[in-house]
Amino acid sequence: MMQIDMDRIYKNMPLEKIPWNSENPPEALVELVESGRVKPCKTIDLGCGAGNYAVYLAGTGFEVIGIDSSPTAIAIAQKNANKKGVKATFLVADVLGDLDEVTETFDFAFEWELLHHIFPEKRKKYVENARRILNSGGKYFSVCFNEKDPQFGGSGKYRKTSLGTILYFSSEDELRDLFEPYFFIEELRVIPIRSKFASHLVNYVFMERK
């Protein structure tokens, strides 16, 4: 997806109608935090959107930076943090670029439903960026649509959404091949989730930087 496409969505569509925008953090992320598997630390939310998950983490003691290619989303995210009274930093940055805007390194990086917006030929650059900004032993958590997800026509690797965006649906093997050169994969499985408007099957990948 191009930056202008994402910014167009945030500019022209109410937040409550954006399918991936949820004020409540996903159960899988909450579980990582509440179990102590990921403890409060320096964290980056890759493709943070309106910043809801970054705000949640900041409220539980994490030092969080959120980045997104959409300037409109970043402005909304900062307002959300201010409204909730938490300290979080939000930057306009393209995860497929050089990430010069990100001058720090982190102990935890995560993306929730970002990777399926990135086509296979561009994923290596993204994963290299994610690894580069993590400290040695840092954790990385990725969730993206699985190829067996029943939504958006229910078949095909590339599927068009009602917003006009095109998503790529990955298999577990594809993600293993993508991540293993850069990360130790601690957990890779397919889980069901409930999003705002539909149920999905997603790839859940929890890793440690090599």
Please provide the spans of the model-predicted regions.
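Class I (Rossmann-like) S-adenosyl-L-methionine-dependent methyltransferase catalytic domain
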Residues: M1-I44, A50-V102, I118-N129, K139-K210
